UniProtKB/Swiss-Prot annotation:
Part of the TCR-CD3 complex present on T-lymphocyte cell surface that plays an essential role in adaptive immune response. When antigen presenting cells (APCs) activate T-cell receptor (TCR), TCR-mediated signals are transmitted across the cell membrane by the CD3 chains CD3D, CD3E, CD3G and CD3Z. All CD3 chains contain immunoreceptor tyrosine-based activation motifs (ITAMs) in their cytoplasmic domain. Upon TCR engagement, these motifs become phosphorylated by Src family protein tyrosine kinases LCK and FYN, resulting in the activation of downstream signaling pathways. Phosphorylated on Tyr residues after T-cell receptor triggering by LCK in association with CD4/CD8. Residues 122-167 are cytoplasmic. The lineage of its organism: Eukaryota, Metazoa, Chordata, Craniata, Vertebrata. One of its GO terms (cellular component) is alpha-beta T cell receptor complex. Keywords: Adaptive immunity, Cell membrane, Disulfide bond, Glycoprotein, Immunity, Membrane, Phosphoprotein, Receptor, Signal, Transmembrane, Transmembrane helix. The modification Phosphotyrosine is found at residues 145, 156. Residues 1-21 form the signal peptide. This is T-cell surface glycoprotein CD3 delta chain. Glycans are attached at residues 38, 55. InterPro entries: CD3_esu/gsu/dsu (IPR015484), Ig-like_dom_sf (IPR036179), Ig-like_fold (IPR013783), Ig_4 (IPR032052), Phos_immunorcpt_sig_ITAM (IPR003110). GO terms for biological process: adaptive immune response; cell surface receptor signaling pathway; positive thymic T cell selection.
Length: 167
């Protein structure tokens, strides 16, 4: 449960230079965020909360609403400033070690099955002859060029019948 709380929200409490951590506290009660101070709390910027008791306790609202802002505890020269920033992860999935191991093992099995399928279908072609049988002799008798044939059977060969052809 503690891990899910750490993963579900991010609290950034940056105390400025003269801050006493005991003077201003951030409490999480159920699903609400509450600020407690020894003296009065003043909102500098951000989410305006509801005062709970005599301006020493401030309810910032629900954690799911991402309360954030700068708050000042005290009004004199010894005032403390606190910055609160909540960010709830609403679409997150808790990822523990068993889930991560399951994902990795499933990925490895799927990859092996895919490689096995490719090997079975593409690796063995039956009825295939050797490479020597694939080669054809295009021109016999060591000829460099193939002699041209007469072309009287083509579509446009009848147009030039009036002129003599050089053979």
């Amino acid at each position: 449960m503690e891990h899910s709380r750490c993963l579900s929200c991010l609290i950034l409490a940056a105390l400025l230079s003269q801050v006493n951590p005991r003077a201003l506290e951030v409490l999480e009660a159920e699903d609400k965020v509450i600020l407690k101070c020894n003296s009065s709390i003043t909102l500098l910027q951000g989410t305006a909360g509801q005062e709970v008791s005599d301006n020493k306790t401030l309810n910032l609202g629900k954690r799911i609403e991402d309360p954030r802002g700068m708050y000042q505890c005290g009004e004199n020269a010894k005032s403390f400033t606190l910055q609160v920033y909540y960010r709830m992860c609403q679409n997150c999935v808790e990822l523990d070690s068993a889930t991560l191991a399951g994902l990795i093992i499933t990925d490895i099995i799927a990859t092996v099955l895919l490689a096995l399928g490719v090997y079975c279908f593409a690796g063995h072609e039956t009825g295939r002859f050797s490479r020597a049988a694939d080669t054809q002799v295009l021109m016999g008798n060591d000829q460099l060029y193939q002699p041209l044939r007469e072309r009287n059977d083509a579509q446009y060969s009848r147009l030039g019948d009036k002129w003599a052809r050089n053979k």
